[in-house]
Every structure is written in C-alpha cells, then in structure tokens.
Amino acid sequence: AAALTMAWFRPDLYHRVLSYSGTFVNLRNSPEAPLGAYEYIENLFPSSEKKPFRIWIQVSESDNGSKTGAEGRRNWVIANARFAKVLKEKRYAYQFVYSKGAGHTQRKVINNTLPQALEYVWLDYTPRR
C-alpha cells in the first residue's frame, strides 16, 4: 500500500499507482486507522472525493493469506479484489490483474505484466513544458 499511500496524501505529486500484491490488509493499525491499510477499502476511497489517479493492481491466486477468510482482513486476494470493486464503483481509471496459479509477487508474473502495467499507468501522459 506504500505507492497508494504516497498518492493518497500527495495527489499533487503522484497520480499513477502500480501495485503488485498490494498490502491493503490490516497489518498495522492505529487510532487514526483502526483497520490499517484496509481503511482504503472500507472508508477512505468510498467516502472521499475522487482523486486524479490511474491505478494498476495485481494479486495472485496463492498470494499472502489466500487460505484465510475475510473476517481478519489479512487475505491479500480478497483485499485486492475488494479494492478493485471500490475503484470500479468510484469510476477510477484502473486495471486489476488476477494471476491464476501464481504466488506472492512471482518473477514470472512481473516479467509478463510489467510492460503492460507501465503502458497503462502512463497512458495519455503529456510532459509539462
């Protein structure tokens, strides 16, 4: 969730987010974020104005926590799929890639998807002059 966090708090600087196996789960929480990074899914994105983001996210079938249920909010597969659903509902420019038969950030997945991911997040980019 690090790339997303940078964009969320500094949308004036960051508009493009590329995430492999995004940690949108409840690993660390605080009084300000009782659900940890799951706050993006549960509260921040649903209740906030749309930001100028272009987001590409990927998760693998056998990613971290894939054998656990949703109740603990520590399943990367469920969290990334739910995040994609929130992005769709808010009409963000996003792509969600689900890699069947793969595990957490496997090299073969990155090798096969990184070119397309970079093309997607930089689509329609015009440099400032």
What are these language model-derived features?
Residues 1-129:
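Non-catalytic cap/lid and distal C-terminal segments of serine-dependent acyl enzymes
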